Amino acid sequence: MKKKILFWILGIIGILIIGGGAYAYSIYSSVSKTLDEVHKPLKRDKDSKGTEEVKISKSEPVSILLLGVDERGNEKGRSDSLILITLNPKNNSMKTVSIPRDTYTEIVGKGKSDKINHAYAFGGVDMSVATVEKFLNVPINYYIEVNMAGFKDIVDAVGGVDVNNDLEFKQDKHHFAKGNIHLTGDEALSFTRMRYEDPRGDFGRQMRQRQVMQAVIKKGATFSSLTSYGDVLTAIQKNVKTNLTQDQMFDMQKNYKNCLENSEDIQIPGDGHKAADGIWYYYVPEAAKQDLTNKLRAHLEVTK
């Protein structure tokens, strides 16, 4: 679920709104209702780094945390994927940081250290944002949360997706052959969940998430796949939450999309091993974390 999830959501919205003439006008109210439903403000401490308002309408640098949440049944779940995106429209650039889910760090508000993805189980998106913000020492202005269990509805809404699979494997009840394959929503969910059979581990899983997301963007970019736009909007409404307002989404789609032209993917260096309690953690050296902090703060033009 790499960088383009943000512009996939905004892109579909943009296609629906500015796609053309009476068709776009006729569905405006449906899109507007969907955006109202997915809006969920953050609860922040007053001293949070991300509380200072970023003026998206004036194209100021901005940061967004993307959370892929694995919720099954009545379980609250954990953040299956954590990706921080920084956008600087002044030089049309974007940086995306994939944060390993097993990263050992302080869980803000819990009074202890644990795997970073546990923050969501302890305190939802509010605690997740606060924890990542402290871990990287950068302000997080906005978030987009996607329920990965319901992600299959989004894939099915665009008619399934095609991907090129570089590793044959089985996951759940599905077999995934090597090469070009078509995925239904249920298959896409299993495809993006597998990591234990992949020698690349969590990084391989993140790559598959990116493949599926890019394929969804490709399908969503054509009107032929959006004739059932109601299904797309329903899937988004049920499975996406964000503190971006409707106006901010439209401004971002308009003012920030060129940032894709100059994109840098960043993997956090570290070492994974079992701790004394027998639990596997991913440890990030302080020097490596500080280098990353400096790079992100410079990209966001943060000086204090």
UniProtKB/Swiss-Prot annotation:
Membrane protein topology class: Single-pass type II membrane protein
Leader peptide range in chain numbering: none
Annotated metabolic or biological route of this protein: Cell wall biogenesis
Cytoplasmic-facing ranges: 1-4
One cellular-component annotation, GO: plasma membrane
GO biological process: cell wall assembly
EC numbers on record: 2.7.8.-
Pfam family, one: LytR_cpsA_psr
Keyword terms: Cell membrane, Cell wall biogenesis/degradation, Membrane, Signal-anchor, Transferase, Transmembrane, Transmembrane helix
Cystine residue pairs: none
Domain of life: Bacteria
Residue ranges, Extracellular side: 26-304
GO molecular function, one term: phosphotransferase activity, for other substituted phosphate groups
Root EC class: transferase
TM spans (from-to): 5-25
Keyword Transmembrane helix: yes
Localization of this protein: Cell membrane
Record NCBIfam families: lytR_cpsA_psr (TIGR00350), PRK09379.1 (NF006897)
Stored HAMAP family: TagU_transferase
PANTHER family registered for this protein in UniProt: POLYISOPRENYL-TEICHOIC ACID--PEPTIDOGLYCAN TEICHOIC ACID TRANSFERASE TAGU
Task of the protein: May catalyze the final step in cell wall teichoic acid biosynthesis, the transfer of the anionic cell wall polymers (APs) from their lipid-linked precursor to the cell wall peptidoglycan (PG).
Similarity remark: Belongs to the LytR/CpsA/Psr (LCP) family.
Annotated protein name in UniProt: Polyisoprenyl-teichoic acid--peptidoglycan teichoic acid transferase TagU
Source organism of the structure: Bacillus cereus (strain ATCC 14579 / DSM 31 / CCUG 7414 / JCM 2152 / NBRC 15305 / NCIMB 9373 / NCTC 2599 / NRRL B-3711)
Upper classification of the organism: Bacteria, Bacillati, Bacillota, Bacilli, Bacillales
